[in-house]
């Protein structure tokens, strides 16, 4: 189901973004878990798209294992939901390990979950 587009909806989005805190726990697990729980349908093949720029968590392996537990494979080995990701090259002053960790994490999640990872390498 699509969210209805209207001037008030757009205004609400802009106002929400004004107070948005750009720093978070940078973990995709909660969003993926919610998306799989909310949208999984055994009669449909759906995809989740994850957009991000860094990963600050302690363990990539823990995230991969958590998503493996959430996004189960069927009898044929296909995952319930395909996971695709886009990585943005956001550097505050210079490249840092968090951006590369995000790319490594999402590349592995996309691979394991029948998806595609696109890592953007420069600003346009």
Which residues fall in each region the model found?
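Gly/Pro- and small hydrophobic-enriched strand-loop and loop-to-helix capping segments
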Residues: 45, 115-124
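Von Willebrand factor
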Residues: 8-46, 57-58, 87-92
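VWA/integrin I-like adhesion module and closely mimicked acidic/polar interface patches used
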Residues: 19-20, 54-112, 118-120
């Amino acid at each position: 189901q699509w969210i209805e587009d209207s001037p008030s909806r757009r205004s609400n989005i802009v106002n929400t973004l004004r107070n948005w805190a750009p720093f978070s726990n940078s973990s995709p697990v909660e969003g993926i878990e919610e998306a799989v729980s909310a949208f999984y349908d055994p009669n449909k093949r759906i995809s989740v798209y994850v957009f991000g720029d860094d990963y600050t968590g302690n363990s990539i392996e823990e995230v991969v294992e958590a998503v493996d537990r959430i996004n189960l494979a069927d009898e044929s080995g296909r995952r319930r939901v395909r996971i695709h990701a886009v990585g943005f090259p956001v550097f505050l002053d210079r490249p840092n390990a968090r951006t590369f960790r995000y790319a490594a994490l999402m590349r592995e999640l996309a691979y394991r979950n029948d998806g595609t990872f696109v890592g953007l390498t420069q600003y346009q």
